[in-house]
Amino acid sequence: MPLKQTITHNLLNIPGWHTNRKIVVIESDDWGSVRMPSREVYEEFLRRGVRVDWDPYCRYDSLATADDLSALFDVLISVKDKNGRHAVLTADTVVANPVFEKIKASDFREYFYEPFTETLKRSPRYDGAWELWQQGMDAGIFHPQLHGREHLNVKKWLRTLQSGEEVTRLSFDLGTFGLTSAVDPRIKNNYMGAFNSGLDEDIAEYDTIITEGQQLFEKLFGYKSESFIATTYTWSPKIEPSLIRNGVRYLQGMVHQKMPLDDDTTFKYKKDNFCGHSSKAGLTY
């Protein structure tokens, strides 16, 4: 890391929580989400002239196979701290994905979702993957926390699908939603920010999404997630009471927060979410 960047990072940490303990935090987002369904879909996008190779998320972000998880767990158990404990990965998880065939049958007017564990069953390449999730949790080296119900702005996505926009419809037909203008200029909307609105009508819908997401999380993992990290670090403070009602106590993320003021066009930037401080609603950063 360049010296200037190192100094900047250290300065940002000064107002936050401090400890003399040597703590290493390992966390990773987007577990459970369909971004690139398969190598075959990736190659089909390229064949159609959609440059998914320009976006690292499209190139590398996919559901983890049993082999992927085994390799990860091998690394985690290869090291121990001074107390003899193995490394632990916090897996920030979206618990659901769209059910494409049902959405299409509704002429793109209704949204349906399924637990990501059902998505895993749709391809033999994920055989045994869910069992590895459970083994990692049982071993205490893999700890999911809530990233959202799905990594998707449902309202915006359905609206664009109804309009017939070419690349978004193509990606839908290929079983994904995670393309941005980085891969094709015809894409005018980014659907990855699940909470990218500050409108009251959308906040009410987000309350449902958060509640259903936490309920599904508890059903899958056997406990409620105490922390939450918003997709794309974007959320309105208006959703925080819903998080609290659903058992969330902590907000993961960066020092900065992108706060939508309307329907995903105007934003305010908050840059003081320091570790150990609290939001106005009472959640701890």
Describe each model-derived feature in a short phrase.
Residues P2-S227, Y233-G282:
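Catalytic alpha-helical scaffold of carbohydrate-active enzymes acting on polysaccharides/glycoconjugates
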